[in-house]
Amino acid sequence: DTTAGLPVEEPPRIALTFDDGPNARYTPMLLDGLKKRNIRASFFLIGENIEGNEDILLQMRKDGHLIGNHTWDHVQLDKIPAEKARLEIEKTNNRIYEASGIYPSYVRPPFGAWIKDMELSVTMLPVFWDVDTLDWQSKNIDSILSIAQKQVHDGSIILMHDGYQTSVDAALKIADLFY
């Protein structure tokens, strides 16, 4: 595309990803904001957080978001026996299926700690990230936006969380900037 003979700069293609949900208070706000912008994201869910939030999973599915696994209770997989790690993932997969009718194909290992051999035993692909907004730590919209603006490039996978108001607000501002 060109405008007056000048190339039109395309915004970078990015993936917004959210860990640790679903959160009864903040995830619905995030889903509403994404829907208004016609944006699909990836949500990596903690199994024990699904109880009582099944309607949120159904909304995620209805809106076309990717639903992934983030273990049952946010354990660092490379610090526990392989069988326990497999069960963390399997239990969460089963709970996601019970709540949404789909088995996830992707897993986001907490802390990015993945055991390569697990791909064979759980038949899932790990999803990592290259932009960590540290939203869970700073809980500051300006700080989160600054990190995103400095680090995002075409193909970036942005790590955020859907359990804080500041994260929801920052995510929607990031969406407005890059989509």
Residue map of PLM features:
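Active-site beta->alpha N-cap acidic-glycine motif
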Residues: 1-80, 84-91, 95-98, 102-103, ...
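Catalytic domains of cell-wall/extracellular-matrix polysaccharide-remodeling enzymes
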Residues: 29, 51, 75-179
